[in-house]
């Protein structure tokens, strides 16, 4: 399962009902993954809300949920561009931003479910059940 920044932020902030849904999805997830650039985005968002302690908050959560960090390759960069061309802001109602496009690309290349909060990813080709999006035809 590929984890988006929005899911981590919802969990850390205790956003209801999303935090509960994210926690349940992570509890049932096998090897949740976040790409390295998404980790950077997540740390920036958490730092804006919590200050320098954000890294400690993130690392504790990462340890608790068994979140691994994946590399981001040239293939990921090309898939990110394709995601933007198809679903990017100003191009599609999903209006994916830069970080969203990177998460989408990581999920696409790994053909993994996507854990995210918000109305953007459900506007893509993922079939969402709660906070988890699946590729069409995959449950």
From Swiss-Prot:
CDD domains: PIN_MtVapC28-VapC30-like
Keywords: Hydrolase, Magnesium, Metal-binding, Nuclease, Toxin-antitoxin system
Binding locations of Mg(2+): 4, 100
Domain PINc: 1-127
UniProt EC number: 3.1.-.-
Cofactor list: Mg(2+)
A GO molecular-function annotation: RNA nuclease activity
InterPro entries documented for this protein: PIN-like_dom_sf, PIN_dom, Type_II_TA_system_RNase, VapC_family
Family: Belongs to the PINc/VapC protein family.
Function: Toxic component of a type II toxin-antitoxin (TA) system. An RNase. Its cognate antitoxin is VapB36.
Name the record gives this protein: Ribonuclease VapC36
Organism, as annotated: Mycobacterium tuberculosis (strain CDC 1551 / Oshkosh)
